[in-house]
């Protein structure tokens, strides 16, 4: 079986497990929307331009709660499941790519709902044609966060408090993704070019892809 077919099968299994458990959209997403509502209610009445903080709140909530969504598959990984994958001859790179694709799809849906909630709660002043560039920024940000979370989950695999340790690994490394995505949306609001920020996101995603594929086998051997 080719690398691509193995990756698609890993993605299919992870999405099937998430569909049955439903943590991302039944538990994490409602809490994220409530957190966004709390932000909107906590803004002082004297602050007139509420829309200005809408995108800031969106990315803060999306990254903080999105980490938990992306880490779900890694946290659910058991030693028995790893042994089965090894016995079946699953390529570690395919596992990384497949899990990253599954997490990215979940994050795209997760961020799409948060984006709608942000527009409804904060009513930002968005220019015409904002949807396409914003969707592009969300897509690349979701892909980067998914790969980073998958890689962090592999590094923290087998350790106590795996979820907390993986979150600590992600926090400093997610900065280029947050900067690129948030500035892309801000540039849209200012009618400026978003090319440099999209290139930053693409470069970060490619670096994470290379690192994840390259480190997948050493990390698997270290976890034995």
Give the positions of each predicted feature:
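Aromatic- and glycine-rich beta-strand/loop motifs that create alpha-glucan
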Residues: 1-28
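Transmembrane helix boundary and interhelical loop/hinge segments in multi-pass membrane proteins
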Residues: 18, 67-86, 100
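Hydrophobic alpha-helical transmembrane segments of multi-pass membrane transport/permease proteins
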Residues: 22-44, 57-66, 168-180, 203-212
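Membrane-interfacial helix-loop-helix connectors in multipass membrane proteins
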Residues: 44-53, 116-139, 185-198
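Selective transmembrane-helix segments that form parts of the transport pathway or gating/packing helices
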Residues: 92-119
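Junction motif at the cytosolic side of a transmembrane helix
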Residues: 120, 205-224
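Transmembrane alpha-helical segments of integral membrane proteins
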Residues: 146-153, 176-188
């Amino acid at each position: 079986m080719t690398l691509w077919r193995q990756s698609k099968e890993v993605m299919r299994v992870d999405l099937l497990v998430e569909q049955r458990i439903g943590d991302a959209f039944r538990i994490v997403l409602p809490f994220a929307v409530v957190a966004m509502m709390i932000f909107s209610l906590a803004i002082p009445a004297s602050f007139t331009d509420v829309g200005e903080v809408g995108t800031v709140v969106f990315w803060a909530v999306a990254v903080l709660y999105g980490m938990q969504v992306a880490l779900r598959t890694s946290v659910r990984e058991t030693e028995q499941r790893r042994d089965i994958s090894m016995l079946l001859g699953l390529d570690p790179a395919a596992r990384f790519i497949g899990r990253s694709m599954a997490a990215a799809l979940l994050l795209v849906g997760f961020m799409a709902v948060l984006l709608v909630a942000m527009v409804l709660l904060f009513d930002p002043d968005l220019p015409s044609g904002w949807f396409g560039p914003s969707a592009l920024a969300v897509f690349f940000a979701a892909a980067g966060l998914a790969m980073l979370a998958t890689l962090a989950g592999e590094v923290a695999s087998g350790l106590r408090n795996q979820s907390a340790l993986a979150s600590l690994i992600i926090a400093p490394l997610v900065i280029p993704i947050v900067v690129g995505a948030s500035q892309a949306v801000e540039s849209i609001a200012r009618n400026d070019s978003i090319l440099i920020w999209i290139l930053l996101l693409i470069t970060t995603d490619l670096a994470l892809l290379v690192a994840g594929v390259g480190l997948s086998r050493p990390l698997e051997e270290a976890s034995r």
